[in-house]
Amino acid sequence: MTQTLSQLENSGAFIERHIGPDAAQQQEMLNAVGAQSLNALTGQIVPKDIQLATPPQVGAPATEYAALAELKAIASRNKRFTSYIGMGYTAVQLPPVILRNMLENPGWYTAYTPYQPEVSQGRLEALLNFQQVTLDLTGLDMASASLLDEATAAAEAMAMAKRVSKLKNANRFFVASDVHPQTLDVVRTRAETFGFEVIVDDAQKVLDHQDVFGVLLQQVGTTGEIHDYTALISELKSRKIVVSVAADIMALVLLTAPGKQGADIVFGSAQRFGVPMGYGGPHAAFFAAKDEYKRSMPGRIIGVSKDAAGNTALRMAMQTREQHIRREKANSNICTSQVLLTNIASLYAVYHGPVGLKRIANRIHRLTDILAAGLQQKGLKLRHAHYFDTLCVEVVDKAGVLARAEAAEINLRSDILNAVGITLDETTTRENVMQLFSVLLGDNHGLDIDTLDKDVAHDSRSIQAAMLRDDEILTHPVFNRYHSETEMMRYMHSLERKDLALNQAMIPLGSCTMKLNAAAEMIPITWPEFAELHPFCPPEQAEGYQQMIAQLADWLVKLTGYDAVCMQPNSGAQGEYAGLLAIRHYHESRNEGHRDICLIPASAHGTNPASAHMAGMQVVVVACDKNGNIDLTDLRAKAEQAGDNLSCIMVTYPSTHGVYEETIREVCEVVHQFGGQVYLDGANMNAQVGITSPGFIGADVSHLNLHKTFCIPHGGGGPGMGPIGVKAHLAPFVPGHSVVQIEGMLTRQGAVSAAPFGSASILPISWMYIRMMGAEGLKKASQVAILNANYIASRLQDAFPVLYTGRDGRVAHECILDIRPLKEETGISELDIAKRLIDYGFHAPTMSFPVAGTLMVEPTESESKVELDRFIDAMLAIRAEIDQVKAGVWPLEDNPLVNAPHIQSELVAEWAHPYSREVAVFPAGVADKYWPTVKRLDDVYGDRNLFCSCVPISEYQ
């Protein structure tokens, strides 16, 4: 039959690229699960009363090339002025070797958070290097492997200060008046929910205030002044006040370490180490503290441990501090952080080394000295005598200066009374400085760079002698070896080869949605039109961003059934927090601020109770019935018991048990009946899009994990993005921002992230995904995700019972395999199965969540039937191996499962096991074999012998 031109143009071509199984494979799987079609399968599984009659109107699909051209036209509306605004954001030079071999490499950006250390040694090493950078620059004992941004790190420092404070009756937190305004904004937001009073004053007046448990100082103030706080910190410590210091990572290369001055906590943004501004993110924050406070620290900590053979290996240490274990008692609600950006900063430090970093920092400071000398020579006054890279220049004709700057396509900081701020960076050249002279002094200034350079080189006093660093940094071999591009390329490749990412195999992690991150979606994030904008640039310079964000928000509104979307939260956990704050402030606006009880099902993800606690709520757990559903009787009882104090319920849909609960609307009605709000966790939106929606179901607010459902990659543990959708009555209570007015958002609330639109530069990924898929493709993606999960469940249920099912024995987009009966019979655990899967070339499913002793499998729509069958075959082969143990062929203490994973050296080592080397290392054949580089890690050893800096030199010899 002759095809029409429309058919030949095939605007939906990307749908077939994104969805793994082709039409024939889909039909084979439908036959296997006993369904006629995708629509029939969906109709059986999803409750009829929540099925959408028509799909959301987000437009027709577009080809990759058409979507890229459309987005390029939008991006071109952004104006790339040279930015000297500073305030924690500067232009950078990302080394091309890192750009090409990491940021643009799916071997790095498609990996998951390193919960399975045996398949994560590469990025764990890069993260450990970052911790070493942090330790060297801050002068403290313990560092984490990144937080979300500098402002949220400040809020975490405040919370940590209260946890470790010996002044238990003190409830006030002091913030120096020259911290960045966005930092103060986020601190105030967090303090309100914790019930802390925030005092803002000149740092030298801190001792005038009583009942202070913690202090936040900024080493280089927001307008550029370098502070020597040594004496003040000493006095504060004598009064048992916990001292946190915000620091600039590039300035720390030259300045004395705050830890050496007595600071308890030091944090800051790592953006200057090679990560583009990206209109606000994503960027990683560094965070360090004294050793005595290590168990109170937020975020991931990478530690050195041993594997089963006694070899050095790396792992995430002290996980009992974290939300997935301690729930509402966790130190923080952080789940995914900023691993990809952290590793860019880490490798930036490796590539430049101490000599290169000092050269960059000294060049920035020299150019700042030259600029200062020239301006002062011509009669302009600087507000601060001591500075690193930022000048606060007093000007008489401020409007004229700003007009000349705009004409020259330059952005200066303009919010300082009777002055302008100028922050230089590693991209600044002598030509840029001459241009700044012209803007500030006029074209006939008569200044000469070389003459000024000679003057300042011999007589620079802009950094106090006491503030100059006098110790060596980055002495470890890893920072002193890989300085040629060849060496660097090979080092990065050696790290990548140690890890298992989506470019090698399916990652079937339940509740994580490890779907395709298509190349066409990733390409725009490195376009300079998106990468080079400062988050506080004038809005007329960001019209492309505003258009893209507005379109994406409109699509998300239609897909979620909500009335508005706020893009600020820069992780799922931050989205939860922002959504709960909206609920809290809504109740307060109705004089019902006493409503503080949050109902959470027993099956909930650990971030839910941790976020509720952060939002100042009391957590009350609702039971689940034997089928894994919310127990309506218990829900009614708990809601009635809470009464006028009921704030909300946090519920995930489909549930974390992998089923569409039939009574979800009734759950919403019960909570609304008692005056509460419904927070629907968006973690499982991949089983809703195009089929149903949170707003249609009856929820009031949700966060959306754009790094799950909408294709932003996990990056080995971040970046994430967690925008919130809200019904109209909650829209006035979403996060605002103290520096930038967010267009279309009528809110007076404080910020939850440093930048107004969170990690804005990765939003094009989700824009591209929705644009290329269209309404038709998005619905089909959800349907195939459901089909793939049911196909796995149907083929594995005889070997591994599926713990929870819905109507007709179906599951949603994921399924829980119950390992507990096997463990009772044979002694083989879910951990043994997870590690044995590595030998078969797979990342393990989610272990022991939401039920201990289980494996939760989520295949997503992107995996073909071929890959699904490969996984199923591996699981069935493992079941046969378990039967061998059960039959006594292999002893429980010595078999391929308990000894897994096996490494390459075992092929030639002494062999005394009752199974062959071939069974050990080639259970699935030799083709495309993934080799882990370490055996199973000793978690107990790692936590008992905590070591969180680079391993000794001998390991590199």
Swiss-Prot record:
Keyword Cytoplasm in the entry? The reply is no
Protein's GO biological process? glycine decarboxylation via glycine cleavage system
What are the entry keywords? Oxidoreductase, Pyridoxal phosphate
Question: Matching Pfam families, A to Z?
Answer: GcvP2_C (PF21478), GDC-P (PF02347)
List the Gene3D superfamilies.
Aspartate Aminotransferase, domain 1, Type I PLP-dependent aspartate aminotransferase-like (Major domain)
Q: What superkingdom does the record give?
A: Bacteria
Q: Which cofactor does it need?
A: pyridoxal 5'-phosphate
Query: Any idea of its EC number?
Result: 1.4.4.2
Q: GO MF annotations for this entry?
A: glycine binding; glycine dehydrogenase (decarboxylating) activity; pyridoxal phosphate binding
Modified positions (N6-(pyridoxal phosphate)lysine) in chain numbering: K708
Q: List the GO terms this entry assigns under cellular component, sorted alphabetically.
A: cytosol; glycine cleavage complex
So what does this thing catalyse? Answer: N(6)-[(R)-lipoyl]-L-lysyl-[glycine-cleavage complex H protein] + glycine + H(+) = N(6)-[(R)-S(8)-aminomethyldihydrolipoyl]-L-lysyl-[glycine-cleavage complex H protein] + CO2
Q: Which family does it belong to?
A: Belongs to the GcvP family.
| PANTHER family to which the protein is assigned, alphabetical | GLYCINE DEHYDROGENASE (DECARBOXYLATING), GLYCINE DEHYDROGENASE, DECARBOXYLATING
Its quaternary organisation is:
The glycine cleavage system is composed of four proteins: P, T, L and H.
Please give the function described in this protein's UniProt entry.
The glycine cleavage system catalyzes the degradation of glycine. The P protein binds the alpha-amino group of glycine through its pyridoxal phosphate cofactor; CO(2) is released and the remaining methylamine moiety is then transferred to the lipoamide cofactor of the H protein.
Q: What name appears for this protein in its UniProt entry?
A: Glycine dehydrogenase (decarboxylating)
